[in-house]
Amino acid sequence: MALLQISEPGLSAAPHQRRLAAGIDLGTTNSLVATVRSGQAETLPDHEGRHLLPSVVHYQQQGHTVGYAARDNAAQDTANTISSVKRMMGRSLADIQARYPHLPYRFKASVNGLPMIDTAAGLLNPVRVSADILKALAARASESLSGELDGVVITVPAYFDDAQRQGTKDAARLAGLHVLRLLNEPTAAAIAYGLDSGKEGVIAVYDLGGGTFDISILRLSRGVFEVLATGGDSALGGDDFDHLLADYIREQAGIADRSDNRVQRELLDAAIAAKIALSDADTVRVNVAGWQGEITREQFNDLISALVKRTLLACRRALKDAGVDPQDVLEVVMVGGSTRVPLVRERVGEFFGRTPLTAIDPDKVVAIGAAIQADILVGNKPDSEMLLLDVIPLSLGLETMGGLVEKVIPRNTTIPVARAQDFTTFKDGQTAMSIHVMQGERELVQDCRSLARFALRGIPPLPAGGAHIRVTFQVDADGLLSVTAMEKSTGVEASIQVKPSYGLTDSEIASMIKDSMSFAEQDVKARMLAEQKVEAARVLESLTGALTADAALLSAAERQCIDDAAAHLSAVAQGDDVDAIEQAIKNVDKQTQEFAARRMDQSVRRALKGHSVDEV
């Protein structure tokens, strides 16, 4: 019995009629396409038997090339040879230039601050470059399968934010592909290993690719893939190993000029070749820009040790989130070409206390998992019992009065998910409400991340608390968030889809979670104070309206007592003494009880005026 059933309209296959589906691993350094044939998932090679497609595009005035041919032009035409474009997806130009100052491209900003790459083919954005890579993969699949693809599953890093995921979807549409689903890369690896090896229990998926690192802690049980926790860094990967080694070679060779893009590309190519060679050898000779020398594995290990340690810190945080100790992990799945580095395997093995799994090619495992999922979603396995449960990394909620955050969906909730919560108006006659969508674990707005704002207008002008607004948060299977606010009596509604201009890094997410724990007691006190201040404001607002309407019901002495109580409440509400505010609210309530009773009696008399007892 399936917990999560995903189907696409019009894609249910007729008996004995298989639809053509593919899984695509759109990687930072390399990309792959895979499919299921004769019940087996396999990656599809090019004419020369190469399964990997370098994620590189070379642009010229009269066209472009993708893959190996493009990569061969990198040293001679650096500015027009775009690689690692995945790192730019969904980011602002300022963010890219701050994070990756070494990129040898000519950038220009679009009107909204997004990056445009100045090439011989004109100004291109990362979505267009990604689309050209996807087109090449789709063409390989169509030729190999002798037909057009009915749908694809494309993998993305677990920490891609909404803008990055939407950019990936846009690239696929630009490439003419029907996206069945975006799938987190670690989850795709879990699918591949779960089906092939049949393991049950807790599994860690350590995914170190060219440009991103993801760690996922999953529980596999009877076909259920449940992500217990995720962590990682969307700006850490094998590319960083390459750049550290390239800088080291530059120092050894005494190359001071950093402005020559050709030399920079040669250094990077030499570093990549050395890194690969050092996975098997203890020493490698390097010849670059007229310099010859040796690099040892020990030197390389010293360079990358701090980066590997960063990945293990993320592993520790993910295990803590999942409530799992390292010794509870049955298997560790290695994903991504960078996991071939001996130091990575050694340190990961030491951390988890077991030898990592490498049975499936770490370069291919994500594409294979995506192909298996695509085969199911396209309708070729309608009776599949496989379940797939992802989680959101940080809580989602709304700002409420007093600068408080009301969490609607807690972090590590499985997705897709929809949650609704009712809110009401604060003031009499309020006809609009500002919806401020927040992300984070703290209690106050100032300590959380703002995702989006929108307004609900057309609320009927009722007394405070009279209108009821239902706010619904919906996170789909791709991790995209939509928020809808609807006033119940009129049906008027407004909504927004959250598309941040750039995403959170691993360190920012970890910091937000850590701060929520460190400041837990302080946050609770701050929330209690804010709630009391909001209640004080509500009481004073209500009292002001009542006095304006019915002050004639009070004697001068009674009015003075109420005014004194209200003034005292207004004064203490400016301070930080929660108990004092609470007592002042109680005092106002005590002083106004008789006034409230008289107002109620007056309302009843007015309602009954002109009616007989029988009519009542």
Swiss-Prot record:
Gene (UniProt): hscA
Q: What is this protein called?
A: Chaperone protein HscA
Record family assignment: Belongs to the heat shock protein 70 family.
Q: Which domain of life is it from?
A: Bacteria
Keyword check for Cytoplasm, yes or no.
Answer: no
Pfam family name, one = HSP70
PANTHER family listed in its UniProt record: HEAT SHOCK PROTEIN 70KDA
The species this protein belongs to is Salmonella heidelberg (strain SL476)
- State the UniProt keywords alphabetically: ATP-binding, Chaperone, Nucleotide-binding
Q: Which GO terms describe its biological process?
A: iron-sulfur cluster assembly
MF-aspect GO terms: ATP binding; ATP hydrolysis activity; ATP-dependent protein folding chaperone; unfolded protein binding
Record function comment: Chaperone involved in the maturation of iron-sulfur cluster-containing proteins. Has a low intrinsic ATPase activity which is markedly stimulated by HscB. Involved in the maturation of IscU.
Q: Does the keyword rRNA processing apply?
A: no
